[in-house]
């Protein structure tokens, strides 16, 4: 509960000064923004016999505070706070044996698409922002590139058979790089994981379980 209170307090702090483009005496202004995004996951590392099935992706939302770098505010740094919900469906099946979690690759046309794993993250984006905006222009082209630090919470697995498993072997902290670009509200989002999500684990066959993703999706900004 105390952690939630701290996150809410931090979110409110970042939201101070939300009214963007409020300096009428100069060309300087802030583009403080809420965002919402949805992405499709593509597994980036080669795992023997691995198959990604169905729709695997995430949704995320958050807030970015804008700090202009020039007098026209066309370049800026952004610091944010967000929440992500991630889920992927594949033929990776976690199984509980002797009070520990093992992983196997299911080779079965019927069962391979039935294994779903989900997890949540609190993200801290830091980005460089370029835009063709002005103090009176609300529709413009933008390119935002940056780096995310993420605090991850336990994995939840719904295997093809058996009960739901809670997996504590998730990397507590991971990072990614990203690029968001587009016009007005609609923007393309590209993101690449720099770390695997599961801590140094092998499958029961001895193959390294290096689960990390490339994300392709859309991100929407709201003032």
Feature-to-residue mapping (PLM):
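Outer-membrane beta-barrel transmembrane strands
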Residues: 114-135, 141
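Surface-exposed strand-loop-strand hairpins of Gram-negative outer-membrane beta-barrel proteins
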Residues: 41-59, 169, 198-200
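Short loop/turn motifs that connect adjacent beta-strands in outer-membrane beta-barrel proteins
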Residues: 22-32, 68-75, 133-141
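Residues that define the transmembrane beta-barrel architecture of outer-membrane proteins
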Residues: 30-32, 53-59, 118-124, 171-177, ...
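Extracellular/periplasm-exposed beta-strand and loop segments of Gram-negative cell-envelope proteins
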Residues: 47-54, 89-119, 152-178
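Residues on the lipid-exposed face of transmembrane beta-strands in outer-membrane beta-barrel proteins
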Residues: 61-67, 81-83, 124-132, 145-151, ...
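Predominantly the C-terminal beta-signal and adjacent terminal strand-loop region
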Residues: 25, 43, 168-223
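Bacterial Sec-dependent N-terminal signal peptides
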Residues: 1-26, 218, 222-223
């Amino acid at each position: 509960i105390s952690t939630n209170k701290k996150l809410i307090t931090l979110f409110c702090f970042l939201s101070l000064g939300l009214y963007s483009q409020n300096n009428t005496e100069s060309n300087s202004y802030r583009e403080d923004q809420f965002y919402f995004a949805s992405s499709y996951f593509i597994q980036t590392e080669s795992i023997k016999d691995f198959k990604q099935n169905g729709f695997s992706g995430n949704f995320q939302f958050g807030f970015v505070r804008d700090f202009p770098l020039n007098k026209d505010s066309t370049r800026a740094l952004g610091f944010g706070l967000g929440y992500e919900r991630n889920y992927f469906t594949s033929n990776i099946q976690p199984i509980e044996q002797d009070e520990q979690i093992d992983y196997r690759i299911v080779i079965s046309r019927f069962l391979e698409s039935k294994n779903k794993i989900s997890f949540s993250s609190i993200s801290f984006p830091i980005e460089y922002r370029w835009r063709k905006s002005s103090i009176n222009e609300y529709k413009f082209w933008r390119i935002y590139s940056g780096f995310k630090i993420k605090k991850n919470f336990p994995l939840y697995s719904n295997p093809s058979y058996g009960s739901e498993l809670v997996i504590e072997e998730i990397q507590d902290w991971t990072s990614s790089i990203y690029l968001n670009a587009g016009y007005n509200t609609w923007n393309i989002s590209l993101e690449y994981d720099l770390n695997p999500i599961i801590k140094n684990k092998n499958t029961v066959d001895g193959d390294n379980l290096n689960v990390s993703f490339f994300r392709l999706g859309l991100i929407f900004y709201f003032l």
